[in-house]
């Protein structure tokens, strides 16, 4: 695959996308930014988009829902259910977009070393066709922008 800025995207199997990004922050702060609505709202979504719905019920079996609104009012909604939660190191949830077929299983792992945190998210799709359609959509650019915004929020001068 390719690197988009500091986001590394790989395709290790026919049905997976793996994204990796290093943040200059302890994993507890990264975990909080992923799971607390008041923080999640500050960084999630590509530049020019706003998060108009942010619901996080952080428990196994709990649901999450996000709706992004882009330029011109276009909305993109997604939702899922938490399958596993191990603070501050692991989150597993389903993910389904309102306007796209299929559901994925997202496994997010945070590893801290030397005050920096490596985020690795493995997205497992129902089929190679769905995975390939996601890649062709340019998803990695939107994800890279989101993680750039998260890095900015986590920067020591912004804490």
Give each language-model segment a name:
Residues 30, 40, 64, 82, ...:
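Hydrophobic pocket/interface hotspot
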Residues 14-20, 27, 51, 63, ...:
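Intrinsic-disorder/low-complexity, polar/charged segments enriched in Ser/Thr/Lys/Arg/Asp/Glu/Gln
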Residues 92-145:
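Beta-strand/loop substructures that line and gate deep hydrophobic ligand-binding cavities in soluble
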Residues 8, 55, 81, 107-109:
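Short, surface-exposed charged micro-motifs
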Residues 155-159:
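Short, highly charged C-terminal tails/helix-capping segments
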Residues 1-50:
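Hydrophobic ligand-binding cavity/cleft-lining segments
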Residues 27-28, 58-59, 83-89, 109-118:
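A short, structured loop/turn motif at beta-sheet edges
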Residues 51-94:
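Glycine-rich portal/gate segments that line the openings of hydrophobic small-molecule binding cavities
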